[in-house]
From Swiss-Prot:
Name this protein carries in UniProt: Large ribosomal subunit protein uL4
Originating gene: rplD
InterPro entries noted in UniProt: Ribosomal_uL4 (IPR002136), Ribosomal_uL4-like (IPR013005), Ribosomal_uL4_dom_sf (IPR023574)
SUPFAM superfamilies: Ribosomal protein L4
Protein family membership: Belongs to the universal ribosomal protein uL4 family.
Record NCBIfam families: rplD_bact
Length: 207
C-alpha cells in the first residue's frame, strides 16, 4: 500500500510503501483494541487507595462500658467498625490492578489501531521530525497546518530533543520513540504522525 510522505510544512515530498499486514488490515477488531486499552489503563492505575482496619486505627482498646445493666447493645471496643472513628470493614487495600495479556494480543491491538487510523486517513508519514530550535510557537504553527485537534507523534528509536521540548507545552500533543507506540494514545489522539524511520522500525517490530 502506497501513501504520501509529507514535510512538516504539510507538502508532499515523496511516496512510501506501507506493509498491508500492519497498516491495512481488512477487518478491524475493535474488541482486541478495547482489550488492550483496558489492559493499559488497569496497569497505569496506582492502586494506592487504603482504609484502616480495626487493628490499624489509633485509639484505646478499653471496653467502653460494662457488659450488662446499661440498656445499650454490648460493645467490646471503641475501634470496632460500627463505632464512630473506628476501623473500616472490607475497605479498599493497596493492590495492583494490572492484569495479564498475551504479547500476541498486545501486538495485534497495535496493528489494528494503526490500521484503523490509516483507514480514516489520519495516519500521516513525515519525512523528518526535527526542529532547529525548541520553540513551542514554531511547532504550534507547524501542527496548525495539519488542522487537527490532537497529535500522537511517533519518531524512530530516538526522539529529536528540540521537537520534544517544543511539544511539552502543547495541549493534546505527545511525542514518543517507536518503543512508546501504544494503542491507547493512538486511539485517543485525532492524528498519528510517523517519521519514515518509525515506519521501518515498526514494520520490523510488528512483522
Amino acid at each position: 500500500m502506497k501513501t504520501k510522505i509529507l514535510s512538516l510544512a504539510n507538502e508532499e515530498v515523496g511516496e512510501i510503501s506501507l506493509n498491508e499486514d500492519i497498516f491495512a488490515v481488512e477487518f478491524i477488531r475493535d474488541d482486541i483494541i478495547k482489550q488492550v486499552i483496558d489492559w493499559q489503563r488497569a496497569k497505569a492505575m496506582s492502586g494506592n487507595h487504603k482504609t484502616k482496619t480495626v487493628s490499624e486505627v489509633l485509639g484505646t482498646t478499653k471496653k467502653p462500658f460494662k457488659q450488662k445493666g446499661t440498656g445499650n447493645a454490648r460493645q467490646g471496643s471503641l475501634r470496632s467498625v460500627q463505632m464512630r472513628g473506628g476501623g473500616v470493614a472490607h475497605g479498599p487495600r493497596v493492590r495492583s490492578h494490572a492484569t495479564k495479556l498475551p504479547k500476541k494480543v498486545r501486538k495485534l491491538g497495535l496493528i489494528h489501531a494503526l490500521s484503523e487510523k490509516c483507514a480514516e486517513g489520519k495516519l500521516l508519514v513525515i519525512d523528518s521530525l526535527k526542529l532547529d530550535k525548541p520553540k513551542t510557537s514554531v511547532l504550534v504553527n507547524i501542527l496548525n497546518k495539519f488542522q487537527g485537534k490532537s497529535f500522537f507523534v511517533i519518531d524512530g528509536n530516538e526522539v529529536d530533543i528540540n521537537f520534544s521540548l517544543a511539544a511539552k507545552n502543547i495541549y493534546n500533543t505527545v511525542i514518543v520513540p517507536q518503543i512508546g507506540a501504544n494503542v491507547y494514545d493512538i486511539i485517543r489522539h485525532e492524528y498519528v504522525l510517523l517519521s519514515q524511520e518509525a515506519v521501518s522500525v515498526l514494520e520490523e517490530r510488528l512483522r
